[in-house]
Amino acid sequence: GKPDGAFXDNITVVESVXFXI
């Protein structure tokens, strides 16, 4: 989960956990 969008253009719960953001 990154502001620029690792998978999307927003930060999801999955991204937050995975990336830690």
Curated annotation (Swiss-Prot):
Subcellular location: Secreted
Induction or repression: By infection.
Main localization category: secreted
Keyword line: Lectin, Secreted
Tissues in which the protein is found: Hemolymph.
Molecular functions (GO terms): carbohydrate binding
GO cellular component: extracellular region
Function: Binds and precipitates antigens of the parasite Echinostoma paraensei.
Protein name: Hemolymph 65 kDa lectin BG04
Organism, scientific name: Biomphalaria glabrata
